[in-house]
Amino acid sequence: MLLYTYRSFDMELPTVDIKDADYIILGLPFDGTTSYKPGARFGPVLIRQATLNLESYILDYDIDIAELKIADAGDVALPVSIEDAIKVAVETIKEVRSINPRALPIFLGGEHSMTYPPVKVLEPKSYVVFDAHLDLRDSYQGSRFNHACVARRIHEMGVKVAIFGVRSGTREEVMFASQSGIEWVHARDYNFDAFVDLVSSLPEPVYVSIDVDVFDLPLVPETGTPEPGGLGFWEVIEALEWLTKRKKVAGFDIMEVSGDRLGNSTSITAAKLLFYVIGMSAR
């Protein structure tokens, strides 16, 4: 067991030791800066529980992910303070990478502020994020590491940022994006060609973040800041399939899964997304 981790719930998948894995799953259960609907700290365990409902065989790829070398490293025991949580998450991710630097890491959240630690450790050149929100505030509710600021903090690392499925933001965020060369696509304007046009020129490796609020609301009612008018499941899958075939991926995360009951539609959607991400990465 890693220094700061614990096992919350076993997935419906056989797992291997971290050192032997091709894919490593790590939960980041934190919702300390949530501004509307708390519960994202339960996201990792809810996703794992939802895997009980799913077949491990991916029809689309003729791949059974139960036959792959997957390690579940557990969940990181994160402090309540966002600054302290970031420090512990960074230290734990570094420990995982020291054991196995070649495996593809997949992080389960947890609010979107928890995307910052993986990006800090993995140092990608580009950040592709599916999100209903721009998350480009400089500060929110007294913190520069609030979930509403994560894309801005990542941009400040010198990482190229591209945001898809947006339908919420402030005038200041839109102006900052324009002035800073940050590309984003409104959910109303999103299509596969728009995604390809923007992502084709991004430098590698790419870190991919999926805030589940990017999906249309009936799919993901249990999330921290829900918004109507989102993308469909297959729209996101199609984009990820293209990206994983053509770009080197540094890591993935699935963030902002919330709720307080087993089998809610948000956690099932996220678990299915997790299985597809693993399957498409193994093609």
Swiss-Prot record:
Upper lineage: Archaea, Methanobacteriati, Methanobacteriota, Thermococci, Thermococcales
Cofactor(s) the record lists: a divalent metal cation
InterPro entries linked: Agmatinase-rel, Ureohydrolase, Ureohydrolase_dom_sf
Temperature dependence (free text): Optimum temperature is 100 degrees Celsius.
NCBIfam families per the UniProt record, alphabetical: agmatinase
Name recorded for this polypeptide: Agmatinase
Catalytic activity: agmatine + H2O = urea + putrescine
Assembly notes: Homotetramer.
Chain's role: Catalyzes the formation of putrescine from agmatine. Cannot use arginine.
GO biological process, one term: putrescine biosynthetic process from arginine, via agmatine
Annotated residues for binding of a divalent metal cation 1: H112, D131, D135, D211
Enzyme Commission number(s) of this protein: 3.5.3.11
PANTHER family: ARGINASE/AGMATINASE (PTHR11358), GUANIDINO ACID HYDROLASE, MITOCHONDRIAL (PTHR11358:SF26)
Binding locations of a divalent metal cation 2: D131, H133, D211, D213
Cofactor note: Binds 2 divalent metal cations per subunit. Co(2+) is the most effection cation. Can also use Ca(2+), Mn(2+), Zn(2+) or Mg(2+).
Recorded family membership: Belongs to the arginase family. Agmatinase subfamily.
pH dependence as annotated: Optimum pH is 11.0.
Native source species: Pyrococcus horikoshii (strain ATCC 700860 / DSM 12428 / JCM 9974 / NBRC 100139 / OT-3)
Single GO molecular function: metal ion binding
Record PROSITE patterns: ARGINASE_2
Pathway: Amine and polyamine biosynthesis; putrescine biosynthesis via agmatine pathway; putrescine from agmatine: step 1/1
